[in-house]
């Protein structure tokens, strides 16, 4: 038994050093790309009307970058601990740290939503009594708060929806749908409806990003279990390509199981529907501004393209008939 342990140690030590040295630079370049890449540059040139979406995507990209970085640091630390049997405890520590990051991300999202609703506090005071509002919200939050220690991600989603309903849907949302007066009432109505859809989109996006973060966390846990199992079977990961393959296999299984659940599909469907509604309102506002500037709207351009397409088909058909007539003059 001692000779087996010596052989295992002698094999694993140079192998772990080789793997870490060969992969460190690749990971460093990847983290730099995640921190300085596409989303940050895209925000600088994004139109003002689309500014909020790149900010949300950048926040999500940074969160996933930290998740990847933590997964690599976890494996880097676990590798030399395989011999002394302390790797399972270290895995639990890193998983707990990941769960803490997800909770911090959720708290930040809720704080941002609270700041946005604070801009309309003057309207809320006129429509609702805060004493009744917060008492009802506090009573409704007891059940979701009781689920948090169990690690149920949908408890965070329930709290997010509860706060959004208390701060916006019960008071300011009805004000947005109130009748408008004046010559500019049509344009003002479109702007208010677009703002209402944007608030609902922000809430749905926060829920969907939180769901994705939880799935990433579970995918990381599955990856760590797979790597530990392979190491114990004397089949350690030796190359960066093999590490990517194991990560993809573990993540695919977790994502497939997660998005087969009905409650997760509802969160995703809510986000897609909210995005589509917001884009429709955005298109209506854009067309109204284009009409004011005597510029062709998207609908008019689409009609022109459709007309040109039909004319091209008719010309092609006429040329074909003309060619047949010339070939058979009799």
Swiss-Prot record:
Record note on biotechnological use: Poly(3-hydroxyalkanoic acids) (PHA), of which PHB is among the most common compounds, are prokaryotic intracellular storage compounds with potential uses as renewable, biodegradable thermoplastics. Cyanobacterial PHB synthesis is particularly attractive as cyanobacteria use CO(2) as the carbon source.
Subcellular compartments: Cytoplasm
Pathway assigned in UniProt: Biopolymer metabolism; poly-(R)-3-hydroxybutanoate biosynthesis
Pfam families per record: PHA_synth_III_E
GO biological process: poly-hydroxybutyrate biosynthetic process
Top-rank taxon, per record: Bacteria
Record keywords: Coiled coil, Cytoplasm, PHB biosynthesis
InterPro entries associated with the record: PHA_synth_III_E (IPR010123)
Predominant place of localization: cytoplasm
Coiled coil (residue ranges): 298-328
GO cellular component, one term: cytoplasm
Function: When expressed in E.coli with Synechocystis PhaC and C.necator PhaA and PhaB, confers the ability to synthesize up to 13% (w/w) poly(3-hydroxybutyrate) (PHB) depending on the carbon source; all 4 genes are necessary for PHB production. Cell-free in vitro coexpression with PhaE gives a heterodimer able to polymerize 3-hydroxybutyrate-CoA. This subunit has no catalytic activity but enhances the activity of PhaC, the catalytic subunit.
NCBIfam families in the record: PHA_synth_III_E
UniProt subunit comment: Forms a heterodimer with PhaC, which may multimerize in the presence of 3-hydroxybutyryl-CoA. Both subunits are required for PHB synthesis in E.coli and in PHA-negative A.eutrophus.
Any further remark recorded for this protein: Nitrogen-free medium induces chlorosis in Synechocystis, leading to the degradation of the photosynthetic apparatus and concomitant accumulation of cytoplasmic polyhydroxyalkanoic acid (PHA) granules which in this cyanobacterium are composed of PHB.
Family to which this protein belongs: Belongs to the PHA/PHB synthase family. Type III PhaE subfamily.
Name of the protein: Poly(3-hydroxyalkanoate) polymerase subunit PhaE
Organism, as annotated: Synechocystis sp. (strain ATCC 27184 / PCC 6803 / Kazusa)
Gene behind this protein: phaE
């Amino acid at each position: 038994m001692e000779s087996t342990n010596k052989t295992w140690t002698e094999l694993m030590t140079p192998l772990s050093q080789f793997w870490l040295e060969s992969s460190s630079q690749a990971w460093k370049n990847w983290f730099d790309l995640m921190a300085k890449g596409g989303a940050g540059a895209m925000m600088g040139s994004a139109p003002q009307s689309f500014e909020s979406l790149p900010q949300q995507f950048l926040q999500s990209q940074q969160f996933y970058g930290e998740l990847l970085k933590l997964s690599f640091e976890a494996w880097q630390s676990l590798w030399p601990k395989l011999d002394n049997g302390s790797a399972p405890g270290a895995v639990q520590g890193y998983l707990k740290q990941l769960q803490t990051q997800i909770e911090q991300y959720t708290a930040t999202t809720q704080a941002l939503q609270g700041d946005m609703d604070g801009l309309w506090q003057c309207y809320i005071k006129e429509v609702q009594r805060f004493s009744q509002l917060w008492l009802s919200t506090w009573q409704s939050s007891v059940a979701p708060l009781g689920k948090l220690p169990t690690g149920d991600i949908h408890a965070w989603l329930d709290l997010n929806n509860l706060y959004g309903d208390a701060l916006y849907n019960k008071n300011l949302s009805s004000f947005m749908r109130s009748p408008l007066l004046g010559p500019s009432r049509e344009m003002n109505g479109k702007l208010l409806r677009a703002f209402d859809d944007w608030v609902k989109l922000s809430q749905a996006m926060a829920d969907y990003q939180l769901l994705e973060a939880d799935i990433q966390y579970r995918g990381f846990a599955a990856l760590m279990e797979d790597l530990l199992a392979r190491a114990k079977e004397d089949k350690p990961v030796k190359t960066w390509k093999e590490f990517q393959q194991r990560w993809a296999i573990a993540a695919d299984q977790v994502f497939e199981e997660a998005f087969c659940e009905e409650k997760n599909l509802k969160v995703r469907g809510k986000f897609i529907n909210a995005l589509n509604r917001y884009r429709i309102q955005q298109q209506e506002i854009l067309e109204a501004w284009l009409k004011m500037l005597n510029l062709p709207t998207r609908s008019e351009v689409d009609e022109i393209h459709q007309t040109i397409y039909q004319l091209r088909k008719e010309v092609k058909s006429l040329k074909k008939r003309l060619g047949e007539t010339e070939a058979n003059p009799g």
